[in-house]
Regions:
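N-terminal cap/leader regions of alpha/beta-hydrolase-fold enzymes
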Residues: 1-240
Length: 240
Protein backbone atom coordinates (compact mmCIF):
# COMPACT_ATOMS: atom_id res chain seq x y z
CA UNK A 1 0.00 0.00 0.00
CA UNK A 2 1.17 3.52 -0.82
CA UNK A 3 0.12 6.86 0.67
CA UNK A 4 0.52 10.38 -0.62
CA UNK A 5 -0.55 13.88 0.40
CA UNK A 6 -2.51 15.58 -2.37
CA UNK A 7 -3.47 19.24 -2.58
CA UNK A 8 -6.75 20.70 -3.81
CA UNK A 9 -8.63 23.95 -3.30
CA UNK A 10 -12.00 24.36 -1.61
CA UNK A 11 -13.77 27.41 -0.24
CA UNK A 12 -10.60 29.48 -0.60
CA UNK A 13 -8.54 26.99 1.41
CA UNK A 14 -5.56 24.82 0.50
CA UNK A 15 -6.79 21.35 1.34
CA UNK A 16 -4.34 18.52 1.95
CA UNK A 17 -5.85 15.08 1.53
CA UNK A 18 -4.41 11.71 2.52
CA UNK A 19 -4.53 9.32 -0.45
CA UNK A 20 -4.05 5.57 0.01
CA UNK A 21 -3.96 2.87 -2.66
CA UNK A 22 -2.43 -0.46 -3.61
CA UNK A 23 0.37 0.39 -6.03
CA UNK A 24 0.59 -3.23 -7.21
CA UNK A 25 -2.98 -3.23 -8.56
CA UNK A 26 -3.59 -2.59 -12.24
CA UNK A 27 -6.41 -0.72 -13.92
CA UNK A 28 -8.96 1.72 -12.51
CA UNK A 29 -10.72 0.63 -9.32
CA UNK A 30 -13.42 2.04 -7.01
CA UNK A 31 -12.67 5.20 -5.07
CA UNK A 32 -13.84 6.09 -1.57
CA UNK A 33 -13.90 9.52 0.03
CA UNK A 34 -13.33 9.40 3.80
CA UNK A 35 -14.60 12.50 5.60
CA UNK A 36 -13.21 12.99 9.13
CA UNK A 37 -14.64 13.95 12.47
CA UNK A 38 -15.21 17.61 13.25
CA UNK A 39 -11.73 18.09 14.71
CA UNK A 40 -10.22 17.55 11.26
CA UNK A 41 -8.27 14.99 9.27
CA UNK A 42 -6.43 13.02 11.95
CA UNK A 43 -5.20 9.49 12.48
CA UNK A 44 -8.68 7.97 12.77
CA UNK A 45 -9.84 8.93 9.27
CA UNK A 46 -6.37 8.38 7.78
CA UNK A 47 -6.19 4.88 9.21
CA UNK A 48 -9.65 4.07 7.84
CA UNK A 49 -8.62 5.26 4.38
CA UNK A 50 -5.52 3.07 4.57
CA UNK A 51 -7.56 0.10 5.74
CA UNK A 52 -9.94 0.48 2.80
CA UNK A 53 -6.98 0.51 0.42
CA UNK A 54 -5.25 -2.43 2.07
CA UNK A 55 -8.21 -4.72 2.74
CA UNK A 56 -10.52 -3.87 -0.16
CA UNK A 57 -8.10 -2.73 -2.86
CA UNK A 58 -9.89 0.57 -3.47
CA UNK A 59 -8.35 4.03 -3.73
CA UNK A 60 -9.29 6.00 -0.62
CA UNK A 61 -8.92 9.71 0.05
CA UNK A 62 -8.94 11.00 3.61
CA UNK A 63 -10.41 14.47 3.09
CA UNK A 64 -9.23 17.68 4.71
CA UNK A 65 -11.87 19.64 6.60
CA UNK A 66 -10.32 22.89 7.82
CA UNK A 67 -7.51 23.48 5.31
CA UNK A 68 -3.82 22.75 5.67
CA UNK A 69 -4.81 19.46 7.32
CA UNK A 70 -5.35 21.51 10.49
CA UNK A 71 -6.53 19.70 13.60
CA UNK A 72 -8.66 21.62 16.08
CA UNK A 73 -7.90 21.09 19.75
CA UNK A 74 -10.98 22.21 21.67
CA UNK A 75 -14.75 21.90 21.49
CA UNK A 76 -14.95 25.70 21.36
CA UNK A 77 -12.86 25.71 18.18
CA UNK A 78 -14.99 22.96 16.71
CA UNK A 79 -18.27 24.76 17.39
CA UNK A 80 -16.92 27.96 15.84
CA UNK A 81 -15.59 26.19 12.75
CA UNK A 82 -18.75 24.15 12.19
CA UNK A 83 -21.22 27.02 12.48
CA UNK A 84 -20.82 28.25 8.86
CA UNK A 85 -20.61 24.68 7.56
CA UNK A 86 -23.95 23.87 9.15
CA UNK A 87 -25.73 26.96 7.84
CA UNK A 88 -24.14 27.76 4.46
CA UNK A 89 -24.55 24.91 1.96
CA UNK A 90 -21.97 26.36 -0.46
CA UNK A 91 -19.19 26.08 2.12
CA UNK A 92 -19.67 22.48 3.12
CA UNK A 93 -20.45 21.39 -0.43
CA UNK A 94 -17.30 23.00 -1.82
CA UNK A 95 -15.30 20.83 0.55
CA UNK A 96 -17.09 17.68 -0.57
CA UNK A 97 -17.36 18.30 -4.31
CA UNK A 98 -13.76 19.46 -4.67
CA UNK A 99 -12.53 16.42 -2.77
CA UNK A 100 -14.53 14.27 -5.18
CA UNK A 101 -12.93 16.05 -8.13
CA UNK A 102 -9.47 15.47 -6.67
CA UNK A 103 -10.15 11.76 -6.22
CA UNK A 104 -11.68 11.13 -9.64
CA UNK A 105 -8.77 12.94 -11.32
CA UNK A 106 -6.48 10.07 -10.34
CA UNK A 107 -5.75 7.56 -13.09
CA UNK A 108 -6.08 4.72 -10.59
CA UNK A 109 -9.74 5.56 -9.94
CA UNK A 110 -12.84 4.39 -11.81
CA UNK A 111 -14.91 7.59 -11.70
CA UNK A 112 -18.08 5.57 -12.24
CA UNK A 113 -17.59 3.67 -8.97
CA UNK A 114 -17.29 6.18 -6.14
CA UNK A 115 -18.64 6.16 -2.59
CA UNK A 116 -18.34 8.54 0.35
CA UNK A 117 -18.10 7.63 4.00
CA UNK A 118 -17.65 9.79 7.06
CA UNK A 119 -17.45 9.82 10.82
CA UNK A 120 -19.47 12.20 13.04
CA UNK A 121 -19.65 15.49 11.09
CA UNK A 122 -17.81 13.70 8.29
CA UNK A 123 -20.83 11.44 7.92
CA UNK A 124 -22.98 14.54 7.50
CA UNK A 125 -20.56 15.63 4.78
CA UNK A 126 -21.08 12.36 2.90
CA UNK A 127 -24.82 13.09 2.90
CA UNK A 128 -24.18 16.69 1.81
CA UNK A 129 -22.21 15.40 -1.17
CA UNK A 130 -25.07 13.09 -2.13
CA UNK A 131 -27.51 16.02 -1.87
CA UNK A 132 -25.57 17.88 -4.58
CA UNK A 133 -26.58 15.20 -7.07
CA UNK A 134 -23.00 13.96 -7.33
CA UNK A 135 -22.57 10.67 -9.15
CA UNK A 136 -21.69 8.54 -6.15
CA UNK A 137 -22.95 5.03 -5.54
CA UNK A 138 -23.30 5.31 -1.77
CA UNK A 139 -23.13 7.79 1.10
CA UNK A 140 -22.35 6.18 4.45
CA UNK A 141 -22.31 7.83 7.85
CA UNK A 142 -20.87 6.38 11.06
CA UNK A 143 -22.29 8.06 14.22
CA UNK A 144 -23.14 10.90 11.85
CA UNK A 145 -25.17 14.01 12.46
CA UNK A 146 -28.37 14.01 10.41
CA UNK A 147 -29.14 17.73 10.21
CA UNK A 148 -28.22 18.54 6.61
CA UNK A 149 -28.24 22.06 5.18
CA UNK A 150 -30.71 21.50 2.32
CA UNK A 151 -33.14 18.64 3.00
CA UNK A 152 -35.24 19.83 0.07
CA UNK A 153 -32.52 18.55 -2.25
CA UNK A 154 -33.00 14.91 -1.25
CA UNK A 155 -34.51 14.21 -4.65
CA UNK A 156 -31.06 14.82 -6.14
CA UNK A 157 -29.54 11.82 -4.36
CA UNK A 158 -28.46 9.20 -6.90
CA UNK A 159 -26.90 6.52 -4.72
CA UNK A 160 -27.80 4.49 -1.66
CA UNK A 161 -27.62 5.89 1.87
CA UNK A 162 -26.45 3.88 4.88
CA UNK A 163 -26.57 5.37 8.39
CA UNK A 164 -24.93 3.59 11.32
CA UNK A 165 -25.74 4.96 14.77
CA UNK A 166 -25.54 4.24 18.46
CA UNK A 167 -29.09 3.89 19.73
CA UNK A 168 -28.12 5.82 22.85
CA UNK A 169 -26.18 8.62 21.13
CA UNK A 170 -27.36 11.74 22.99
CA UNK A 171 -26.40 13.97 20.07
CA UNK A 172 -28.69 12.21 17.60
CA UNK A 173 -32.13 11.97 19.23
CA UNK A 174 -35.03 9.89 17.87
CA UNK A 175 -36.78 12.93 16.39
CA UNK A 176 -33.69 13.75 14.31
CA UNK A 177 -33.55 10.18 13.07
CA UNK A 178 -37.25 10.30 12.18
CA UNK A 179 -36.87 13.54 10.22
CA UNK A 180 -33.91 12.13 8.28
CA UNK A 181 -35.81 8.95 7.44
CA UNK A 182 -38.80 10.98 6.27
CA UNK A 183 -36.57 13.15 4.08
CA UNK A 184 -35.07 10.11 2.37
CA UNK A 185 -38.35 8.20 2.14
CA UNK A 186 -40.26 11.11 0.63
CA UNK A 187 -37.54 11.42 -2.02
CA UNK A 188 -37.61 7.71 -2.87
CA UNK A 189 -34.01 7.15 -1.80
CA UNK A 190 -32.74 3.62 -1.20
CA UNK A 191 -31.78 3.98 2.47
CA UNK A 192 -30.83 1.85 5.47
CA UNK A 193 -30.36 2.82 9.10
CA UNK A 194 -28.91 0.57 11.79
CA UNK A 195 -29.03 1.31 15.51
CA UNK A 196 -26.62 -0.43 17.87
CA UNK A 197 -28.13 -1.01 21.31
CA UNK A 198 -26.28 0.38 24.32
CA UNK A 199 -23.91 2.34 22.06
CA UNK A 200 -23.28 6.09 22.15
CA UNK A 201 -21.28 8.52 19.97
CA UNK A 202 -17.85 7.93 18.34
CA UNK A 203 -18.12 4.15 18.63
CA UNK A 204 -15.63 3.55 15.79
CA UNK A 205 -12.83 5.60 17.36
CA UNK A 206 -10.58 3.71 19.81
CA UNK A 207 -9.46 7.06 21.24
CA UNK A 208 -12.99 8.29 22.00
CA UNK A 209 -12.56 7.46 25.67
CA UNK A 210 -9.94 10.21 25.95
CA UNK A 211 -12.75 12.76 25.71
CA UNK A 212 -13.58 11.79 29.28
CA UNK A 213 -17.34 11.79 28.70
CA UNK A 214 -18.29 8.10 28.46
CA UNK A 215 -21.99 8.94 28.58
CA UNK A 216 -21.53 10.84 25.28
CA UNK A 217 -18.55 9.37 23.39
CA UNK A 218 -17.25 5.85 23.89
CA UNK A 219 -15.52 3.26 21.71
CA UNK A 220 -17.44 0.03 21.15
CA UNK A 221 -15.47 -2.76 19.47
CA UNK A 222 -18.53 -4.82 18.55
CA UNK A 223 -20.38 -1.89 16.94
CA UNK A 224 -17.16 -0.86 15.20
CA UNK A 225 -16.77 -4.32 13.63
CA UNK A 226 -20.45 -4.65 12.74
CA UNK A 227 -20.65 -1.23 11.11
CA UNK A 228 -17.47 -1.84 9.10
CA UNK A 229 -18.96 -5.10 7.79
CA UNK A 230 -22.15 -3.33 6.75
CA UNK A 231 -20.08 -0.78 4.85
CA UNK A 232 -18.11 -3.52 3.09
CA UNK A 233 -21.31 -5.35 2.19
CA UNK A 234 -22.81 -2.22 0.65
CA UNK A 235 -19.63 -1.58 -1.32
CA UNK A 236 -19.92 -5.09 -2.73
CA UNK A 237 -23.51 -4.37 -3.73
CA UNK A 238 -22.95 -1.01 -5.42
CA UNK A 239 -19.51 -1.58 -6.98
CA UNK A 240 -20.25 -5.04 -8.33
Amino acid sequence: MKTESIHYQADGLDMIGHLAWDETATGPRPGVLVFPEAFGLGEHAKSRAERIAKELGYVALGCDLHGGQALLTSLEQVMSALQPLRTEPAKVRARTVNALTALTARKEVDAGRIAAIGFCFGGTMSYELALTGADIKAAIGFHSGLAVTSPGDAGQIKGKVLTLLGADDPGIPPEQRAAFIKMLGDAGVDWQMTLYGGVVHSFTNPHADKVGRPEFARYDAKADARSWKQMVDLFGEVFG
